[in-house]
């Protein structure tokens, strides 16, 4: 197969004091996200999408929250590891698109830094990486400011070198 599509989703609830980390960007906020790792909901969704595209399971199977070595783990490092698997299977990024669902904090001021971090970690061009954010108009858990969710979609292309 020359093309593979993956979809990922993750959610973390708010808990302790902030800041939060989204796409490797630290964002000041009154609460942090509860998680075994750094709680980067967007990069977790992206890792799931990449793993799913290659039928390699999910982030929990590769980085279990029962394993102490992943306590407080930097999700950018997890993403880079997942990308080594993508490359070892002979694929590269075609494009990726993330949708962050959060009533607060506002993501817009941080979107370009998020895109740049991802671009670096997946070895892609900036025009292959899209990150956007939306609210739920105060509906549901995100609207009540109980947590943040993220959806990720990726298209992988067979590498020319493969």
Curated annotation (Swiss-Prot):
Signal peptide: none annotated. Pathway: Isoprenoid biosynthesis; isopentenyl diphosphate biosynthesis via DXP pathway; isopentenyl diphosphate from 1-deoxy-D-xylulose 5-phosphate: step 4/6. Binds 1 divalent metal cation per subunit. One of its GO terms (molecular function) is 2-C-methyl-D-erythritol 2,4-cyclodiphosphate synthase activity. The record marks 36, 135 as: Transition state stabilizer. One of its GO terms (biological process) is isopentenyl diphosphate biosynthetic process, methylerythritol 4-phosphate pathway. It holds the Pfam family YgbB. It is an enzyme of class 4 (lyase). Keywords: Isoprene biosynthesis, Lyase, Metal-binding. A divalent metal cation binds at residues 10, 12, 44. SUPFAM superfamilies: IpsF-like. It catalyses: 4-CDP-2-C-methyl-D-erythritol 2-phosphate = 2-C-methyl-D-erythritol 2,4-cyclic diphosphate + CMP. Its cofactor is a divalent metal cation. Gene3D superfamilies: 2-C-methyl-D-erythritol 2,4-cyclodiphosphate synthase. 4-CDP-2-C-methyl-D-erythritol 2-phosphate binds at residues 10-12, 36-37, 58-60, 63-67, 102-108, 134-137, 141, 144. It comes from the Bacteria. Its EC number is 4.6.1.12. Involved in the biosynthesis of isopentenyl diphosphate (IPP) and dimethylallyl diphosphate (DMAPP), two major building blocks of isoprenoid compounds. Catalyzes the conversion of 4-diphosphocytidyl-2-C-methyl-D-erythritol 2-phosphate (CDP-ME2P) to 2-C-methyl-D-erythritol 2,4-cyclodiphosphate (ME-CPP) with a corresponding release of cytidine 5-monophosphate (CMP). Belongs to the IspF family. Homotrimer. This is 2-C-methyl-D-erythritol 2,4-cyclodiphosphate synthase. It comes from Pseudoalteromonas atlantica (strain T6c / ATCC BAA-1087).
């Amino acid at each position: 197969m020359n093309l593979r599509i993956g979809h990922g989703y993750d959610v973390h609830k708010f808990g302790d004091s902030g800041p939060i980390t989204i796409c490797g960007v630290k964002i000041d906020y009154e609460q942090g996200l509860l998680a075994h790792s750094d709680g980067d909901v967007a990069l977790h969704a992206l890792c799931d999408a990449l793993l799913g595209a290659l039928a390699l399971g999910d982030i929990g199977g590769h980085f279990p929250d029962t394993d102490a070595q992943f306590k407080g783990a930097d999700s950018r490092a997890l993403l880079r590891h997942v990308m080594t698997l993508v490359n070892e299977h002979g694929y590269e990024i075609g494009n990726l698109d993330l949708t962050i669902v959060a009533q607060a904090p506002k993501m817009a001021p941080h979107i370009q830094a998020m895109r740049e971090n991802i671009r670096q970690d997946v070895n892609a061009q900036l025009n292959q990486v899209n990150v956007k954010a939306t609210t739920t108009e105060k509906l549901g858990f995100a609207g009540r400011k109980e947590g943040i969710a993220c959806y990720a979609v990726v298209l992988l292309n067979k590498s020319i070198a493969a």
